[in-house]
From Swiss-Prot:
GO-annotated molecular function: ATP binding; ATP-dependent protein folding chaperone; isomerase activity; unfolded protein binding
EC number: 5.6.1.7
Native organism: Pelagibacter ubique (strain HTCC1062)
Any one cellular-component term (Gene Ontology): cytoplasm
Name of the protein: Chaperonin GroEL
Known role: Together with its co-chaperonin GroES, plays an essential role in assisting protein folding. The GroEL-GroES system forms a nano-cage that allows encapsulation of the non-native substrate proteins and provides a physical environment optimized to promote and accelerate protein folding.
Protein encoded by which gene: groEL
Length: 554
């Protein structure tokens, strides 16, 4: 396949056209008065969204050189979304500003590599300044404010996320699903829940709810199948004498063993429920170990030399309550040692950091949440499917933003944190005029987000930036929703520092590479016109031959 090569200003001009098309489409969504973007789908209704990365992902340009620029900036949005879960529009705007300013300096004859060194030095300096100015999140009100800002001013979403985080903790799992109805609601499962129900409906204790509920039960964890209860008789007698119920979790309970348990339950001799162990293969072993640590018990496994006939009551786990329905089992308030549970959580966290598989990471995080606190589900409602999807995008962004805020703290919102951080660049010392130009262009680019927020609100960004830089209060900012200057912390207009920092870091990383680009190579486009001409010329003659079919003896 033949290639086309472009050099110098011709290459950079094509690249910038692509950057502009993508960034200009994404940046209309920024701020409280940002607009929506409608995306056509090959099936079903179009998608309406304000999520920067969702918009960026849909853009592919026909011109291959322009498309290269667009794809590089798309990478900025994707990377920021991956790391911080929000701030994708800000990252895209910063990348566009750095590229456009950088290319101006390079076109004017400055050395691209030195300009990039200046950009890198400035970004590191600003990141340090942002982290130094961050405040720790103190209460659920601040969590709710972060969620509200990220959900485009929707207080209901902000409050719901704050409530969910309060219930399950920062380590807990919060998932977002589409609801069946119009209302958005929060469903919290406390304790450890896994997707295995009772093995027989005869275990039910609450006929109205079709559930088994046991108070203060012993929990037997067995790795293999139970087919015969003979080895367990001494243990079962000890449980009956203790006057407490029993929950059995094993690979399976079948045949005679299950029948014996059911008969004992029906006769009233033993309150019992049997469920299958969660997961498969190695994951099942890990989850049984998790339950053992949570409940203060031991997994009965012949691998470690423990036989069923030798099990004592001290080998069993226990908890405050278990609740089992036909699909799920929930263990509430396990009696395991707190120090052991924390050590297990730390071990799983380490595995999360080491794994390269997204699927494994998700499963490990689920295990961590079940050990650490619980699971909350936010069910997003709406009048139409399109509205539900748009709302779900905002809930996911808000959820990611609140997690980031809890992790690293918060700074003033509305683009002001970057604006004030740009002032710290006055003290940064670099070598040579070309590197100074790199620092200067970052200082200018840091104004781009607040200018875009004000532009989307129909206000002149230069006036707002000028007013804010004239005064000395670093908490002051511009409330674009109400068009007034306010104390941003007092008004609850705040951003997670992790989101702002990641947006700048990723934008500068890709933009710096684009600024240093001197040549671009792409496949030569097919000459469609000549191909089509050949076809049309050949057709009549070919078709004419078919007239001979009339002479066939049919």
């Amino acid at each position: 396949m033949a290639k086309v090569v472009k050099f110098d200003s011709e290459a950079r001009a094509a690249m910038i056209r692509g950057v502009d098309i993508l960034a200009n489409t994404v940046k209309v969504t920024l701020g409280p008065k940002g607009r929506n973007v409608v995306i056509d789908k090959s099936y079903g209704a179009p998608r309406i969204t304000k999520d920067g990365v969702s918009v960026a992902k849909e853009i592919d340009l026909e011109d291959k050189f322009e498309n290269m620029g667009a794809q590089m900036v798309k990478e900025v949005a994707s990377k920021t979304n991956e790391e911080a879960g929000d701030g994708t529009t800000t990252a895209t705007i910063l990348a566009q500003a750095i590229v456009k300013e950088g290319v101006k300096y390079v076109t004017a004859g400055m050395n691209p590599m030195d300009v990039k060194r200046g950009i890198d030095a400035a970004v590191e300096h600003v990141k340090a300044s942002l982290i130094a100015s961050a405040k720790k999140v103190k209460d659920t009100d601040e969590i709710a404010q972060v969620g509200t800002i990220s959900a485009n001013g929707d207080k209901e979403i902000g409050n719901m996320i704050a409530k969910a985080m309060q219930k399950v903790g920062n380590e807990g799992v919060i998932t977002v699903e589409e609801a069946k109805g119009v209302e958005t609601e929060l469903d919290v499962v406390e304790g450890m829940q896994f997707d295995r129900g009772y093995l027989s409906p005869y275990f039910i204790t609450n006929a109205d709810k079709m559930t088994t509920e046991l108070e203060n039960p012993f929990i037997l964890l067995h790795e293999k199948k139970l087919t015969n209860l003979q080895p367990m008789v001494p243990l079962l007698e000890a449980v009956v004498q203790a006057g407490r119920p029993l929950m059995i979790i094993s690979e399976d309970v079948e045949g005679e063993a299950l029948a014996t348990l059911v008969v004992n339950k029906l006769r009233g001799g033993l309150k019992v429920v049997a469920v299958k162990a969660p997961g498969f293969g190695d994951r099942r072993k890990s989850m049984l170990d998790d339950i053992a640590i949570l409940t203060g018990g031991q997994v009965i496994s012949e691998d470690i030399g423990v036989k069923l006939e030798n099990v004592k009551l001290t080998d069993l786990g226990s908890c405050k309550r278990v609740k089992v329905d036909k699909d799920n089992s929930t263990i509430i308030s396990g009696n395991g040692k707190k120090s052991e549970i924390e050590a297990r959580c730390a071990q799983i966290k380490q595995q999360v950091g080491e794994t390269t598989s997204d699927y494994d990471r998700e499963k490990l995080q689920e295990r961590l949440a079940k050990l650490a606190g619980g699971v909350a589900v936010i069910k997003v409602g709406g009048a139409t499917e399109v509205e539900v999807k748009e709302r779900k995008d905002r809930v996911e962004d808000a959820l990611n933003a609140t997690r980031a805020a809890a992790e690293e703290g918060i700074v003033v919102g509305g683009g002001c944190a970057l604006l004030y951080a740009s002032q710290s660049l006055d003290t940064l010392k670099v070598k040579g005029d070309d590197q100074k130009a790199g620092v200067a262009l970052v200082a200018k680019a840091l104004q781009a987000p607040i200018r875009q927020i004000t532009l989307n609100a129909g206000v002149d960004g230069s006036v707002v930036v000028g007013k804010l830089l004239e005064q000395n209060k670093k908490n002051m900012g511009y409330d674009a929703q109400n068009e007034e200057y306010v104390d941003m912390f007092a008004k609850g207009i705040i951003d997670p520092v992790k989101v702002v920092r990641t947006a700048l870091q990723d934008a500068a990383s890709i933009a710096g590479l684009l600024v240093t680009t001197e040549a671009m190579i792409a496949d030569k486009p097919d000459d469609k016109d000549s191909g089509a001409g050949g076809m049309s010329g050949g057709m009549p003659g070919g078709m004419g031959g078919m007239g001979g079919m009339g002479g066939m003896g049919m």
